[in-house]
Amino acid sequence: RNEMVEFFAHRIEGYEFNGPVKVWGHNTFDKPSVVSEVEYDESWLVDEYEFTASVTDKPVKVPITGPYTLANWSFNEAYEDTEALAHDLADLVNEEIEKLVEAGARYVQIDEPALATTPDDHAIVGDCLERIADGIPEDVRIGLHVCYGDYSRIYPEILEFPVDEFDLELANGDYDQLDVFKDPEFTADLALGVVDAHDADVETVPEIKENIQKGLEVVPPEQLTVSPDCGVKLLPRTVAYEKMANLVQAAREVEQELDEGEIEVERSAVTADD
């Protein structure tokens, strides 16, 4: 894949590209324009999913750039406002997930980095997620990734979203916002970022274990999964691999220590179904 909006815009009818725009410093972004009603033509990700699933015996998570980010990070030349565009895009995402489910996918993550920069639009994101989840089987796990921002402006409202898991970027800020998610109680599953996706320094296994245990301050073990803070494509491949290898080792060690009673969890367990 290339840039997270560009990849999908090339596959959605109604988008066109007119050249790059400057975003910061000398960096540019090939920002697409919506010039007509968006339409679903053919699958965006089924081939990618089927290939990935064929080379592993583990479950495969399929990330999809969310409709709000696709709308917010594009020039809108066809719709009344961002909300109307995002709603139509959400319906297309729903169609794509249906195709992925037919292909065997059971774990989908919606990436909405734009929510971190425009938190007042959380209601639009919630409406989009309702459209995305409509008719999707209950055994399909839907996660939502929101990049680093002022999480206090969207929590606890995000708990009303129809998703099973929230993937949050907290290692980047040294967990300075961890307390945001302690009150009121975090009732969904938490996918905690435990390695920094923007720093080429590779965290050690003991460091990652400490980060994982921070998640246990928010949710019990059965509600906690671990992940990198964000996508690792901007890191050198060797660095990304080392970070992920250490993450896996740290998670296994924490899981074993929990099983052996070496780590005490003081908070009461609340399941995501409650």
Tell me the role of every PLM-derived stretch.
Residues 1-274:
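Domain-level signal for soluble alpha/beta catalytic cores
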